[in-house]
Swiss-Prot record:
Biased composition (Low complexity): 336-345
Taxonomic source organism: Mus musculus (Mouse)
Residue positions of motif Nuclear localization signal: 273-281
Gene Ontology terms: biological process: protein import into nucleus
Pfam family, one: FAM53
UniProt modified residues of type Phosphoserine: S119, S306, S309
Its job: May play an important role in neural development; the dorsomedial roof of the third ventricle.
Annotated protein name in UniProt: Protein FAM53A
Record bears the keyword Transmembrane helix: no
Any one of the GO CC terms: nucleus
Localization annotation: Nucleus
Record field: compositional bias (Polar residues): 323-333
Family: Belongs to the FAM53 family.
Length: 402
């Protein structure tokens, strides 16, 4: 090994030797102090990945600028050689091994750039199972949830005991019919998977005799399985066992009563509930509210003003005319009777002519003298009137007074 190293060193120039030694030596020691592992994946500025072998010699991929091939003893290219020569003695590799095996914390955490690559060496990642966090209120491992909700077949596979043919034939969707090798002496009655709402029954493996395929004793997985079930399955199973004649078809309440309790320990049951569903009160108020048609309202107002009020005026004017003609009165009395009822209907007084309202009868008499006997003038005056609905009361009062 030493002969091979010296031969390769003689073939290199002196300036290349010093440059590469300065790059590889202190940089690798600094990286070792930071990461705490044996050989980090990146050592020099050229970023050549290094891997730790069991022999303790650093090896790596082929260098981009190294002119030599890999040696027969596993030593790679010239950067690895300079890194080995920069160490003070041959016992330095063992010193680094002791540094890696020590359980003390590293001097400094690795930089953020190397967090994923330096988290675990490849040797330990191969033989170790993937990391799973412990169960807590926030994080529930997926394997535990599968064991508890996947039916009896998953639980038998997790326990690792029993007949493999039995474990393969039991499917969570099919009814559970445990085949007992000793005969039909088992007190357990098979129940379908729907009776326990997708979860494993607490009666399986929790009795004193155990499952029928395990005649040696109770299931070793039952205590661990029982922790995740609700309080209903922790009760004595002798009282919870249904009778042999009762089936889920004959007694449909069986599956509901033997299901999981609706409590906080089983949050998956609450998914079917309608929680905090908002009531739609806006739509109800919208349907009860009457719709307003403003065009129709204006149309009816016009019709009522032009038709209804005119009919009332025509009737009242006809009665006035008949009474006036039939009664023996002089012309002055006739003019005096007609004037108060028709005087507000004559012309509409403007803001500059208030004398018509203030003067009273003497000014209204000449205007009404010619049109007193013509009912058509009264109708035309009624259309122009300011108060078309209040004139009836005034007419009756004047008639009674005179």
């Amino acid at each position: 090994m030493v002969t091979l190293i010296t031969e390769k060193l003689q073939n290199q120039s002196l300036d290349d030797l010093t440059r590469r030694a300065c790059e590889a030596g202190p940089y690798s020691a600094e990286k070792l102090n930071k990461s705490g592992h044996l050989f980090p994946l990146e050592i020099s500025v050229d970023k050549s990945p290094w891997k730790a072998l069991r022999g303790g010699w650093p090896t790596g991929s082929q260098a981009a600028s190294g002119p030599f091939s890999v040696g027969p003893h596993g030593v790679s290219h010239t950067e690895g050689l300079k890194w080995q020569l920069e160490s003070p003695g041959p016992m330095d590799v063992g010193h680094f091994l002791d540094l890696h095996d020590s359980t003390g914390p590293p001097a400094a955490p690795p930089t953020k750039r190397h967090c994923r690559s330096l988290s675990e060496p490849e040797e330990l990642a191969r033989c170790r199972s993937p990391w799973r966090p412990g169960s807590s209120k926030v994080w529930t491992p997926i394997s535990k949830r599968r064991c508890n909700s996947g039916g009896s077949a998953t639980l038998q596979c997790c326990s690792g005991v029993g007949n493999p043919t039995l474990q393969g034939t039991l499917v969570p969707g099919l009814p559970r019919r445990p085949v007992s090798p000793a005969g039909p002496t088992s007190p357990l009655t098979p129940r379908p998977a729907s009776a326990s709402s997708g979860f494993v029954d607490g009666s399986e493996g929790s009795t004193s005799s155990g499952p029928p395929w395990l005649s040696t004793g109770p299931c070793p997985f039952s205590s661990r399985r029982r922790l995740s079930l609700s309080q209903e399955h922790l009760v004595d199973t002798g009282a919870c066992l249904p009778s042999a004649s009762s089936t889920p078809t004959s007694t449909p309440e069986l599956g509901r009563h033997h299901g999981l309790l609706r409590c906080r320990s089983q949050p998956c049951v609450l998914d079917g509930r309608r929680v905090r569903r908002k009531r739609r009160r806006e739509e109800d108020a919208r349907w009860t509210r009457p719709s307003l048609d403003f065009l129709k309202m204006t149309r009816t107002l016009k019709n009522s003003k032009s038709l209804c009020s005119l009919d009332y005026e025509d009737d009242e004017d006809d009665t006035q005319e008949k009474t006036l003609v039939s009664s023996p009165c002089n012309s002055q009395g006739l003019v005096g009777i007609i004037t108060p009822s028709s005087s507000p209907r004559i012309p509409r007084p403007g803001p500059d002519s208030p004398s018509i309202w203030a003067s009273g009868e003497p000014e209204a008499n000449p205007g009404e003298g010619g049109s007193s006997g013509d009912p058509s003038d009264w109708d035309s005056a009624g259309e122009e009137g300011i108060f078309p609905l209040d004139h009836g009361d005034l007419d009756l009062e004047q008639i009674e007074n005179n």
